[in-house]
């Protein structure tokens, strides 16, 4: 199956499309990718350089791919870091085009805004994700901070997290995946839908990792297309994130150990325990 992935790219390291492409390929999918930014490396380093893709350039790429029938078999659109505020409408247009071909096709929204209370996107992007992209999404994958910003609610405990996720469900998505909730010595991911709440957790490593959210979103996209049910998907994606952080922890570099992790990742053999808690 084919995924259209519209998000950031770096020459060095693994964030955005740079991690999504090999992950989706590992799961057996073609990935047609359009970059929203072209950076030397992720901004977690002391310095970086690069350019933002304009709405015109992104739209032209989508148009050209469609003209050569490259989107005929596209089964999902995945979007992440937008770069520019005006790119939200271009992503929305691409989603609308793909769904017009077949309304069963999926849109997975990784609402990249920030983390740990810190916003790292341009002014206005938060509201454009909430108002333009969220209503189109079949699945949305916020971290705890992004869940708070999108819902307009404080998310300072479990009950507040569930309430905020249910608020997002009213806006269109079928499932809200909430990532990265630290609980004791674990880091937990949740799947919340009208059918219930599922929890899966891996070991918490007290270190900053750049790109794990992008990795998780690509896993969710690929596993959905592979027919995984929500609980099994959550189990595998959480286990894969635990694996990649373990492998990265072994190295002094700031970049995710994507190649090593993907080589060791056997989808049919990995998984963590999933609880259905509501």
Predicted segments — roles?
Residues 215, 219, 223-227, 240-247:
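Solvent-exposed, amphipathic alpha-helical segments
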Residues 202-220, 233:
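Short glycine/threonine-rich catalytic loop with a Thr-x-Gly-x-Asp
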């Amino acid at each position: 199956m084919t995924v259209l992935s519209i998000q950031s790219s770096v020459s060095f390291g693994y964030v955005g499309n740079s991690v999504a492409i090999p992950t989706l390929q590992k799961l057996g999918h073609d990935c047609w990718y359009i970059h929203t930014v072209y950076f030397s490396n992720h901004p977690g380093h002391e310095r970086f350089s690069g350019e933002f893709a304009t709405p015109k350039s992104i739209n032209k790429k989508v148009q050209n791919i469609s003209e050569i029938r490259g989107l005929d078999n596209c089964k999902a659109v995945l979007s992440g870091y937008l770069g520019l505020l005006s790119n939200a409408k271009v992503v929305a247009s691409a989603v609308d085009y793909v769904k017009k071909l077949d309304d069963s096709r999926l849109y997975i929204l990784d609402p990249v805004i920030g983390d740990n209370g810190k916003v790292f996107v341009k002014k206005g992007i938060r509201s454009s994700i909430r108002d333009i992209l969220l209503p189109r999404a079949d699945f949305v994958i916020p971290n705890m901070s992004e869940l708070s910003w999108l819902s307009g609610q404080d998310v300072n405990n479990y009950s507040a997290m569930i309430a905020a996720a249910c608020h997002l469900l009213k806006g269109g998505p079928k499932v809200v995946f909430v990532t990265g909730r630290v609980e004791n010595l674990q880091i937990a991911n949740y799947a919340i839908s009208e059918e219930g709440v599922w929890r899966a957790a891996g070991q918490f490593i007290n270190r900053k990792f750049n790109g794990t959210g992008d990795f998780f979103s690509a896993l969710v996209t690929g596993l959905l297309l592979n027919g995984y049910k929500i609980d099994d998907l959550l189990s595998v994606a959480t286990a894969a994130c635990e694996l990649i952080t373990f492998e990265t922890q072994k190295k002094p570099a700031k970049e995710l150990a994507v190649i090593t992790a993907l080589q060791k990742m056997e989808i049919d053999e990995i998984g963590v325990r999933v609880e259905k808690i509501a």
